[in-house]
A protein has these predicted regions:
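Flexible, solvent-exposed loop/hinge segments and secondary-structure transition points
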Residues: 2-9, 18-134
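Repetitive helical segments and hydrophobic/amphipathic motifs
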Residues: 13-14
């Protein structure tokens, strides 16, 4: 009984250590520190920016000073037209750039979804400018 109590923790410790070594050997990177990540939500920032049917807020994630992801937040735009904006690559165009660089990029409205895409571009620019300040 005493031998089992001694061996079990040792085996578990060895297993945990080996899992950590395997994880690092596979090139996994630790998650960025919270201080390395900035998230800008344009819901309040662009309250007066309206697409065809309403606001088109975005969530912009910046990691270590570079735009990592841009996501459209829930909105009331007609899905079939808003999907054109999402499929156009407009939100991905700024990924990999600093917020200041991305805010200055020329971005074109999407044909067939002009009002929605212009509102998304306005949200994107405002959010990027806000991120560049921080």
């Amino acid at each position: 009984m005493n031998m089992k109590r001694l061996i079990l923790p040792a085996v578990l410790a060895a297993l945990l250590v080996s899992l950590g070594l395997v994880s690092n050997a596979q090139g996994s990177r630790p998650a960025p520190k919270a201080s390395d990540t900035l998230v800008v939500n344009t819901t309040d920032l662009c309250r007066d920016v309206i697409g065809y049917d309403g606001p088109t807020p975005l969530k912009i994630t910046v990691v270590k000073g570079v735009v990592a992801k841009v996501e459209a937040l829930p909105n009331v735009e007609t899905p079939r037209f808003f999907d054109l904006v999402l499929q156009s690559g407009l939100l991905k165009a700024v990924v990999g750039k600093t917020p200041a660089e991305a805010a200055k990029m020329p971005l074109d409205a999407v044909s067939g979804a002009t009002y929605s895409s212009e509102a998304v571009i306005a949200n994107l620019r405002a959010g990027l400018k806000e991120a560049a300040k921080r």
